[in-house]
C-alpha cells in the first residue's frame, strides 16, 4: 500500500484486531463534579464519569482561564512500578489525604524536576485530563499496591481472551472521546502526552 491514508486505515484495523475484545463503549458519561479549585491561570476540577460500560472513574481536568474552545491533551501517567498514585503523577492533586499529596509531590520531584506536566500545559492554554489506568491510584487494589498481583492479573486477562495493555489502550481512546465532548475543548485539536514508560499507549 503506497497511499498513506489507506495504509493508516489498514494498519489501525490490524492493531485493533490484535488488541482483542474491547471494554463496552458508552457515551452515557453521567459526569459529576466532585471538587473544584482555582489555580494561577486555570481551574482544576475533579470529576467522576462513566469511562466504559464497566468502569466509573475519577479524573482531574484542568481548564485555562479565558474564552475557549482550547486545544486539549490526554495525559497518560507513567508506570514506574509505583501503583499508589496514577493521575496524580501528571496533575497536582487536591482534596486528598496528605499522604497522597506528599506521594505525588515526591514523585514529581524525583521524576519530573518538580513539574506537574498537566499544570504546566494548563497554564499555557491547554485543557488537560488525566485518569488512573486500571490498578493505579484510586483504581488500585483495595488490599494495597502489589506489583506481583498486577502481573498475576495481566495473566488472568490473557486467560479470558483479553489483553491488559490493550484494555488500557481502549480506555485511553475512550478518554480522548470524552475529552472531546467538553464544551471548553476544540475537538479537532486533541492529542496525547505521555512519559516514557507508557509510550506504547500513544500508538493506537
What are these regions (language model features)?
Residues 1-16:
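N-terminal pre-domain segments of enzymes
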Residues 26-66:
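N-terminal cap/lid segment of alpha/beta-hydrolase-fold proteins
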Residues 182:
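Acidic-histidine catalytic/liganding microenvironments
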Residues 193-202:
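Conserved small/polar residues in nucleotide/adenosyl-binding loops
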Residues 77-170:
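Cap/lid segment of the alpha/beta-hydrolase catalytic domain
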Residues 185-192:
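Alpha/beta-hydrolase fold nucleophile elbow
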Residues 70-78:
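Short beta-strand element of the alpha/beta-hydrolase
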Amino acid at each position: 500500500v503506497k497511499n498513506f491514508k489507506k495504509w493508516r486505515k489498514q494498519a489501525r484495523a490490524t492493531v485493533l484486531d490484535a488488541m482483542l475484545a474491547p471494554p463496552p463503549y458508552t457515551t452515557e458519561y453521567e459526569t459529576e463534579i466532585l471538587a473544584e479549585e482555582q489555580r494561577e491561570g486555570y481551574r482544576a476540577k475533579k470529576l467522576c464519569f462513566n469511562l466504559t460500560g464497566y468502569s466509573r472513574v475519577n479524573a482531574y481536568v484542568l481548564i485555562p482561564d479565558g474564552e475557549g474552545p482550547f486545544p486539549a491533551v490526554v495525559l497518560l501517567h507513567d508506570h514506574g512500578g509505583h501503583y499508589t498514585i496514577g493521575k496524580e503523577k501528571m496533575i497536582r492533586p487536591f482534596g486528598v489525604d496528605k499522604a497522597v499529596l506528599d506521594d505525588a509531590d515526591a514523585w514529581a520531584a524525583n521524576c519530573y524536576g518538580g513539574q506537574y506536566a498537566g499544570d504546566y500545559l494548563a497554564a499555557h492554554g491547554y485543557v488537560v485530563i488525566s485518569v488512573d489506568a486500571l490498578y493505579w491510584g484510586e483504581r488500585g487494589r483495595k488490599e494495597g499496591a502489589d506489583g506481583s498481583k498486577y502481573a498475576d492479573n495481566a495473566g488472568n486477562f490473557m486467560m479470558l481472551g483479553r489483553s491488559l495493555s490493550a484494555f488500557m489502550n481502549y480506555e485511553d481512546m475512550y478518554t480522548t472521546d470524552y475529552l472531546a465532548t467538553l464544551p471548553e475543548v476544540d475537538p479537532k485539536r486533541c492529542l496525547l502526552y505521555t512519559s516514557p514508560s507508557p509510550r506504547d499507549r500513544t500508538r493506537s
